[in-house]
Amino acid sequence: MAITAAMVKDLRETTGAGMMDAKKALTETNGDMEAAIDWLRTKGLAKAAKKSGRVAAEGLVGVAVRAGRGVAVELNSETDFVAKNADFQQLVRDITNVALDAATDVEVLKATHLNGRPVDDVLTDAIARIGENMTLRRLHALEGDTIVSYVHNAAAEGMGKIGVLVALKGDAAKAQEIGKQIAMHIAATNPASLSEADLDPALVEREKSVLSEQARESGKPEAVIEKMIEGRMKKFFEEVTLLGQKFVINPDVTVAQAAQEAGVEVTGYARVVVGEGIEKKEEDFAAEVAKTRAGA
């Protein structure tokens, strides 16, 4: 596979590796970006990299909670201007509240009635009225004894660019207090899972493979290498799992310890970021102006 300058640039931006190292990594892995990241890491030429998932789509995440159930709904728009529109925000609010009743996924939500009509039809009308394409993209529902919500970069009450839900059990008042702090922590740190047991096995295996290769590059005895791998995997679990992470409000304890000290237990969470994983075309403003003038 031909290695292009754009591929090298993307890999450098993702890993911080030098140009020649990035090119060699892509050559060694036949242009496979994820494999190239791992190759650089095994050579100690890149930091552990999370999947890039550039956020490009606009819109809002709406969150709502009622009687032990919470939902986070993502409604995308083409521009941030429309996301600030009062009609659009009311649509997010209405759809989020409808989702609270029983919706379990986006397709169910689209068929659910809002003011006597399917949500999908209401959305079609809004597209025609507001004049911009919109997509009802994701719905996360969470249930538990106590559900706490948090919105980061709020555009209006109950909606913003990042929506978080946390499920807890224990004393309701204490759960509300610590739950809000944990929700803010989740918004900031983006954990991969609640606990080690919930992690994607493929992610764990990939990390272990990279760390094993790194350890063996040291040339130390096998017994020492095994200890190195064990220690590094322990650190990995602490960094990517919610319960294992250092609590941002008080880094002297983990999230699990903070919850335990408050007399509650975290049983689940959801984190939704507007446009997460969607890549939209970057517009060259100067070229766009030139094109417009040429056509005038």
UniProtKB/Swiss-Prot annotation:
Alphabetical keyword list: Cytoplasm, Elongation factor, Protein biosynthesis
Family: Belongs to the EF-Ts family.
InterPro entries registered for this protein in UniProt: EF-Ts_dimer_sf (IPR036402), Transl_elong_EFTs/EF1B (IPR001816), Transl_elong_EFTs/EF1B_dimer (IPR014039), Transl_elong_Ts_CS (IPR018101), UBA-like_sf (IPR009060)
Keyword Cytoplasm among UniProt keywords: yes
Role according to the record: Associates with the EF-Tu.GDP complex and induces the exchange of GDP to GTP. It remains bound to the aminoacyl-tRNA.EF-Tu.GTP complex up to the GTP hydrolysis stage on the ribosome.
Ranges for region Involved in Mg(2+) ion dislocation from EF-Tu: 79-82
Organism the protein comes from: Paracoccus denitrificans (strain Pd 1222)
This protein's name: Elongation factor Ts
Pfam families: EF_TS
